[in-house]
Regions:
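Extracytoplasmic beta-rich repeat domains
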Residues: 82-93, 126-149, 177-192, 230-276, ...
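Beta-propeller blade signature
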Residues: 213-224, 304-318, 372, 475-483, ...
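Short, conserved, GDST-rich strand-edge loop motifs in beta-rich repeat architectures
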Residues: 202-213, 261-262, 288-305, 442-471, ...
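Repeat-solenoid scaffold signature
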Residues: 188-224, 331-390, 403-415, 419-424, ...
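Blade/loop signatures of beta-propeller domains
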Residues: 33-78, 240-250, 399-403, 467-468, ...
Length: 607
């Protein structure tokens, strides 16, 4: 990595050199930097349960369970399976609380409870919320659901038609149901909620429908809305006040959520909060991303389009913003900003720092000081030509003018695509290795801006997209990233995008799934394939591991292809339409040849 005038720069050639190093190094143990750990308050000692999709507030997706090791993982066998009854994209993480597993399906968002204390884990109960069927027609990218959360004897989850529901974890009886989304304007909810200090944190989807983004805090007791913070509009509605202290000048000024847009465009400007939220109890701050501005055609929204494609730090009690950083000002390519942020404490350039690490959709692994929002490092983790780096003095992404899109102009070979070098699929961090394990894409695209008018409840995109395989011809990869060194330790190439999440354990094993349907275990140190199992459908879910009632370690994954990347299968799209699924259909034509729709839970254990 070269540093020039305060900028972090690593182009396609520099990335190729890094890749060459990592592929060679993949067979050799890389020395881990010491003392990189999540804050103890955000990642308490592992009790063997899995009560939230990210495992803990620090979003490490790391388990201290170690019965399954590099040496014995090859003997893993199926303990039980369960059909969800829904053959759509299964993106959720199962939860395990005590002797019960909880699963939320894609639409119609059925919540199941399985009895882990009985042979075969039979169903304890199921809750059917009966969401509005019309929600399916306004969902951007399949009818997915990313999971539930447990707190104080209740399961909390969202439905596609905009409801947040609390259910008694023991009985399956509903406790409350709050309607917070409006499908008539194209608003849906697909994210997993996060429970913080007696509040249910929820955000909306709908950026491709011109829906204004927000995050809400609901009272966990009765479901009433405590506060709402919008991603666009006046400071008062974004909950920006005197405590707001962004690090960079580009994020300072009054009512930037209005003035950085054409008149009234912020009202339909997106910035939806449909991804991951982390929480630092010591700082008492939540961290959440904001989605892309709408429409995709940048000619229709000149300006930085605050506060989209960025990250907020907020007070969970009031929602008041403390700082903000914009990953991609005036987002040209739907790079969004909702990925997971892993909270870590480490030494950076000789100083102890409270950081968050974020593998972002625009192609960079960012290291931010989570107390201020200062960018400490920003390095590509794959092929990037849409930008030339990040200016560490100003914090601003350096756009490559050759890849700027506009109305009526076809721009070819933009890397990464609108789906990003990595989309929502969450990474995992191991304090044993100091490595972040990143499931991601390797895709490029052609884009053409087109005119579009806003009509409530209909697509508001304004862009023709055709995706193609990235450099090397493989369409996905699984990368182990050395956080301290800001470079890859090893890289595994995959034929299709790796659209599943990852989990890493104290047994030094990393689990992830492929869109062909392989569930894989690899060495956390070297990336060596240790075990794989072919499931009945492509995998886009989030693996977990837990201690069962018998005291043994189990690993679970939902299999069922779909989501944006797998829409050609789950939506049975015509592969002759190169722009179907916002361009994804073109690069995934052959997915139909290797997998079919499904919806099955697989759980594994040692003999």
């Amino acid at each position: 990595m070269a540093r020039i005038d305060g900028r972090t720069k690593l182009g396609m050639i520099g990335w190729t050199l890094l890749v060459g190093f990592a592929l060679v190094a993949g067979a050799v143990a890389q020395p881990a930097e010491p003392a990189i750990r999540p804050p103890a308050a955000a990642a308490p000692l592992d009790d063997g349960q899995w009560t939230m999709p990210a495992k803990n507030y620090a979003s490490t997706r790391y388990s201290e369970l170690a019965e399954i090791t590099e040496d014995n993982v090859k003997t893993l066998q199926v303990a039980f399976t369960f059909s969800t009854g829904v053959n759509k994209g299964q993106e959720a993480a199962p939860l395990v609380v005590g002797d019960t597993m909880y699963i939320v399906t894609p639409f119609p968002n059925i919540l199941y409870a399985l009895d882990l204390a009985r042979p075969g884990a039979p169903m304890k109960w199921k809750f059917e919320p009966n969401p509005e069927p019309a929600a399916q027609g306004v969902a951007c990218c399949d009818v997915v659901n990313r999971g539930a959360a447990f707190s104080n004897g209740r399961i909390y989850f969202n439905t596609l038609d905009g409801h947040t529901i609390a259910v008694d974890a023991a009985t399956g009886k509903p406790v409350w149901n709050t309607h917070i989304g409006n499908i008539n304007i194209g608003e849906t909810i697909t994210m997993a909620p996060l429970m913080v200090k007696g509040k249910v944190l929820v955000g909306n989807s709908g950026g491709e429908m011109g829906v204004r983004g927000w995050i809400k805090a609901l009272d966990a007791g009765d479901g009433h809305v405590i506060w709402t913070a919008y991603s666009t509009g006046p400071d008062a509605e974004v909950l920006i006040g005197p405590d707001f202290k962004p690090h960079y000048d580009m994020d300072k000024g009054k009512d930037l959520g209005v003035t950085s847009w054409p008149p009234d465009a912020w009202k339909i400007g997106g910035g939806n909060v449909w991804g991951w939220i982390s929480y630092d109890p010591d700082l008492d701050l939540i961290f959440h991303g904001t989605g892309n501005p709408g429409p995709w055609n940048p000619d229709l929204r000149p300006g930085d389009n605050k506060w989209t494609s960025g990250i907020f730090a907020r007070d969970p009690d009031t929602g008041n913003a403390k700082w903000f950083y914009q990953w991609t000002p005036h987002d040209l390519h739907d790079y969004d900003g909702i990925n997971e942020q892993v909270l870590l404490d480490m030494t950076w350039q000789g100083k102890p720092r409270k950081v968050l690490v974020r593998p972002e959709r625009n192609g960079y692994v960012y290291l931010l000081d989570r107390t201020t929002g200062e960018v400490l490092s920003a390095v590509p983790f794959g092929p990037v030509n849409s930008s030339k780096g990040v200016d560490l003095k100003t914090g601003r992404l350096i756009v490559n003018p050759e890849k700027e899109t506009s109305t009526g102009k076809v721009v070819r070979n933009i890397c990464p695509t609108a789906s990003g070098l990595k989309d929502w699929q969450p990474s995992a961090f191991s304090p044993k290795t100091g490595l972040l394990y990143i499931p991601h894409n390797n895709l490029c695209m052609d884009e053409e801006g087109v005119e579009v008018n806003y009509i409530a409840g209909t697509p508001y995109v304004g862009m023709n997209v055709r995706m193609i395989a990235g450099p090397g011809g493989h369409r996905g990869a699984f990368t182990a990233w050395n956080v301290a060194a800001a470079k890859p330790a090893w890289i595994l190439k995959e034929n299709f995008p790796v659209w599943s999440g990852a989990v890493v354990t104290a047994g030094n094993v990393v689990f992830y799934g492929t869109m062909e349907g392989w569930f894989k275990a690899v060495s956390a140190t070297t990336g060596k394939l240790l075990w794989q199992f072919k499931t009945s459908s492509g995998i886009i879910g989030q693996p977990i591991t837990y201690r069962g009632p018998d005291g043994h370690q189990y690993v679970a994954i939902l299999s069922g292809v779909g989501g944006w990347a797998g829409a050609i299968v789950s939506g049975d799209l015509d592969p002759r339409d190169a722009t179907a699924a916002l361009g994804f259909a073109n690069v995934m034509k052959d997915l139909k040849d290797v997998t079919t729709p499904g919806g099955t839970l697989y759980v594994f254990r040692l003999p």
